[in-house]
Amino acid sequence: MPKSEIRKLLQEIKKQVDNPGNSSTTEIKKMASEAGIDEKTAEEIYHLLTEFYQAVEEHGGIEKYMHSNISWLKIELELLSACYQIAILEDMKVLDISEMLSLNDLRIFPKTPSQLQNTYYKLKKELIQVEDIPKNKPGRKRKTQKNTKKEKTNIFGKVVPAEFKAPTSIKEQISYDKSREKNLVDLLSGVKSNVQLLSENQGEENNVYDLLKSIYSLSSLAVQKEELDKKYQDLQTKCQELEQENSYLKQQNETMTDSFHTLVLQVADFAYASDLDQIQALPLFSQQLVVTLNQLGVFKENYKQM
C-alpha cells in the first residue's frame, strides 16, 4: 500500500477525532477496508487518539501539556507504538513515519520528528516502559556544611595552617587545590602569583614562558570553540529550514501526483467513451480538465510558454 494511503487513513482518523460524529468508526472502517488495512487496527488507533486528546484536555489543553512536567503520557506511548506498527507493516521507513506523525505534517503528536523517532526506538529496545514519563529535572546542588571555626585561606582558597611551614621547592609554592577554584578573580590572581614566584627564581625563565604560552593556547582554543559553537547553531537552524522546505516539497509532490492521476483518468474516460457520450460530456469534461490543469499549475495565460 502506498505511503499516501496510510497518510490519508491517519488524516481521516484525526479528522474524525477532531470532529466526532455518529458514523466516525464506520467511516474509518470503510476507508481501512478499501486500503487493505485491518479494520480493528484502524479502530484501535481511533480510540487511542481519542483518549490521548481527552488526557491532554485534562491537563489544561495542548499548550499547557507541552509546557507541563510530563514528557510522555502512557496513552500517548500506546498510540505512538500503534501508529509506527501500522505504517511499518506497509513498508514505510521510520524516518518518514516520524515526519508524517509530527508537528511538521499531520500533527497527530505535539512532538518533533526526532522526539518521536528517539522515543519509538527506546520503546522498541525496552529502554523505557509504557507509562507516564516525567521530564528530566535538573539536579539539585548539595548544601555544604560551613565550618563553624573560621580559618584563614590564601588567594588559592587553600587553608593556611596555624604553624607556617616554609615551602622547600618552587613546586610547593605554586601548588593548589583545583577543586577550590571559585571564580575568575581567583584564577587570575593565582596566575599572577605563579608568574611572580617563577620569575623570582633564577633559571626559571623558560618555565614562565611555557606557562604563558599554555595560557595563550588555551584561550585561543576557547575562542575557536566559541566560533565553532556559533557555526554549529547556524547549521542547525539552516538544517531545520531545509527539513521544513523538504517536507513542503514532498507534500506538493504528492498533491501534484494525485492531480496528474485525476487528469489521466478524465482524459481516458472521455477518449474511450462512445461518440454520443463524448458529445454530451464535452462541456463538463472541459470544465473538469481546466480545474485539474490549474491544480497542476497550468493556466490559460502560461500554457504556451511551458
Swiss-Prot record:
Question: From what superkingdom does this record's organism come?
Answer: Bacteria
Q: Which Gene3D superfamilies match?
A: Motility repressor MogR, DNA-binding domain
Molecular function GO labels: DNA binding
Query: What Gene Ontology cellular component terms go with this record?
Result: cytoplasm
Q: Which UniProt keywords apply?
A: Cytoplasm, DNA-binding, Repressor, Transcription, Transcription regulation, Virulence
Record-linked InterPro entries: MogR_DNA-bd, MogR_DNA-bd_sf
- Tell where it localizes: Cytoplasm
Explain the purpose of this protein: Transcriptional repressor of flagellar motility genes, such as flaA, during extracellular growth at 37 degrees Celsius and during intracellular infection. Binds directly to gene promoter region and probably prevents RNA polymerase binding. At low temperatures, MogR repression activity is modulated by the DegU response regulator in an unknown mechanism. Required for full virulence.
Q: What is this protein called?
A: Motility gene repressor MogR
Species per Swiss-Prot/TrEMBL record: Listeria monocytogenes serotype 4b (strain F2365)
Its gene name is mogR
